[in-house]
Amino acid sequence: MPYPELMKPLDLGFTMLKNRALMGSMHVGLEEVENGFERMAAFYAERARGEVGLIVTGGISPNERGRPMPWGAKLTTEEEADHHRIVTAAVHAEGGKIALQILHFGRYAYHPTWSRPRPSRRRSPPSPPTP
């Protein structure tokens, strides 16, 4: 193996990774669909089973105003936390670790009502709504 350290455990002090392989954050689009968290749990568990030591989830908004769309995933209630626990448990069952990426979409976030002052009327390419 050309990278002998890659598959060795890594002690982070607060947790031990089974190896140094990291799956970077990507939005899989399952957070917002029916049974999405169960499907996401299976998706990430398969990666953990395939020797990924640490998985970073796609971005989850920390509040209502930080979501990219009205239906965008957020983590603000105990019920929403329970959905994420399904994913965490599935990854841990396969010996992997998972980190939730907290992501406020900032100027690209969806805002149903724009108050003054507001940005220009020009639409930003990543964000469909126009203020």
Where are these regions (language model features)?
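Non-globular sequence segments
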Residues: 92, 103-131
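N-terminal capping/small domains of soluble enzymes
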Residues: 1-105, 112
